[in-house]
Amino acid sequence: EDNAPKRRIYANGKYSGWFDIRSGVAQGCPLSPLLFLLVAQGLYIAIQQEGVRGIMMGSIEVIISQFADDTTLALRSWRQLKKANIALQRWCDATGMKENVKKREGLAMGRYRHGRMPEGVKWVKEGEHAVSLGCPIGNDMDTAAWWAQKILEVRKKSNRWSNLVGKGFFGRNLIVQSMYFGRMRYWLYSMVMEKYQVKEVQKDATRLWWSRDPMDETRRHRRPVAERTARGPRAEGGLNEMDWDAHTRAFRAQWVTRYCRPEKSKWKEIWDEALLHDDDGKREMEGRGIFFCPLTAKERKMIMGRVPAGMRYVKECLKDHFTMDIRMNVKVLTAVGSES
């Protein structure tokens, strides 16, 4: 603390006075996250050195998932918890980091679901879910029920937007895109929204766009522009109105495009294990490139049939990739998937 780093703010052409940073990380500093990578890597090494064993997914062992200071451990059994605690404490002692014990929670899976678990962890109750990076994780997770609650929360907030009254489409669209669709987009990367729920979201958005009184859910409204025309690009006379169904499918389809890129990642290895091996364990000669080859309906069905029952989201990603014909039109995927 005697030599605390100092910062000052540059705003409106002027500098503020210098001030000390005595805790935390300097926000907005491009070097800060890079430096923190060195600290986070130390935890990964400590876990490895302690011999902590993770969960096997085929031949792939998953032990730890890290994103900045958010860490999730996938332990093979409750016996691994002691080793993990030793590694964690050694890392804290070496780096000066400190775990927020109040936020520690655990999810018992498999044969451990109904057994007695060690103390010191807030274990998720049966029927509930844990949260990792904002995403719910649970046994027999009811994603439809989770989405229903999320849509209800967003709808209640949107029904208070009295400032929409009197605004035109483009003014309303800025708010609908950022404050309505924007409150749900993040989870499209990891959770399947059911078809009927997709229609609910689209119906709500249409009301917010076109109704004279957007807060009145019972009031009927009439479109001044045909739906098909409104969804076209503005350069061609459209309004760029969001097609939420295409949007959700594009989010899933782009995972296959990312999967085929050369960058290495643990999740790609897990997909390899599930998708690129036949019943005899033989690997596809084309590798990931098979997803951009002309495949027959039978071949597509065969690949999708390899996806384990617990990986429904992956199966939906493949389905959307195939039905949107990404092999022929990657530009369409990029346009739909990135619209905001």
What positions do the PLM features span?
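Short, conserved micro-motifs composed of acidic
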Residues: 2, 13-15, 84, 98-129
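Catalytic palm subdomain of template-directed nucleic-acid polymerases
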Residues: 24, 64-94, 110-111, 141-143
